[in-house]
Swiss-Prot record:
Enables the recognition and targeting of unfolded and aggregated proteins to the ClpC protease or to other proteins involved in proteolysis. GO terms for molecular function: protein-macromolecule adaptor activity. Belongs to the MecA family. It comes from Macrococcus caseolyticus (strain JCSC5402). It holds the Pfam family MecA. InterPro entries: MecA_C_sf, Neg-reg_MecA. It comes from the Bacteria. Signal peptide: none annotated. Coiled coil: none annotated. This is Adapter protein MecA. Disulfide bonds: none annotated. Homodimer.
Length: 220
């Protein structure tokens, strides 16, 4: 999850569908289940609050935008009634206001739901999982990867090893995928561990373009 502090009262964060699934939710849950959508939103807001000290002690205005790879959420805190809430909502508490907004915004746009459902049904994504012996191998791979492509990936820590999950969508050619994997195996080893096992027992260290993040934190 990427978080951007727009100003004192507004935050923007982006989650890939891999990020959403890593938190125990399915992408369709957000659009077809009000309860799941609310659970997901509040769990993410707790993470955001811990990282950015973004306390939500009043009315919130939430905008949710869906893209091919994930969702972007913009959260704005109402300050001095800058955000004009309907007068008949005055007796609602913050949870009810936010939940009503989420429900209305997610269920009023049928075209958006149809797009997400089709994307889920038509997806032909391939994935590959490897493990690195130590962090140094992760760093070397990140710096010597010949292609800096924008992909969905996750770096897990599980039983003292670093596991790298990479997802290729149908826009990448078979040759490009094979080349990427071949280069990856110069620094890592194949594994029989499943993505479900990593999700359940592993800890996500980095998500969404792991290589760029590694290069950001470990300068050479």
């Amino acid at each position: 999850m990427r978080i951007e502090r727009v100003n004192e009262s507004t935050l923007k964060f982006y989650l890939t569908y891999t990020d959403i699934e890593a938190r125990g939710f399915k992408r369709d849950d957000l659009w077809t289940s009000r309860k799941k959508g609310e659970e997901f939103f509040w769990s993410v807001m707790e993470e955001v609050n811990q990282e950015e000290d973004f306390f939500f002690d009043g009315p919130l205005w939430i905008q949710v935008h869906a893209f091919d790879k994930g969702i972007e959420v913009v959260v704005t805190k109402s300050k001095n009634d800058d955000l004009q809430l309907p007068e008949d909502d005055s007796d609602l508490n913050i949870d009810e206001k936010v939940n009503d907004f989420i429900n209305n915004s997610m269920h009023s746009d049928s075209e958006l739901r149809d797009l997400l459902m089709r994307a889920s049904e038509e997806s032909t994504e391939q994935f590959f999982i490897v493990h690195f012996d130590d962090l140094e191998d992760v760093i070397q791979f990140s710096y010597h990867n010949y292609e800096d492509v924008d992909i969905e990936d996750l770096l897990y820590m599980y039983e003292g090893k670093y596991y790298y999950y990479v997802e290729f969508d149908d826009h990448m050619s078979e040759d490009a995928i094979h080349s990427y994997i071949a280069h990856l195996l110069e620094y890592a080893n194949e594994t029989q561990i499943s993505h479900e096992q990593l999700d359940e027992y592993g800890k996500i260290v980095m998500s969404h373009n792991v290589k760029r993040q590694v290069k950001q934190y470990f300068k050479q």
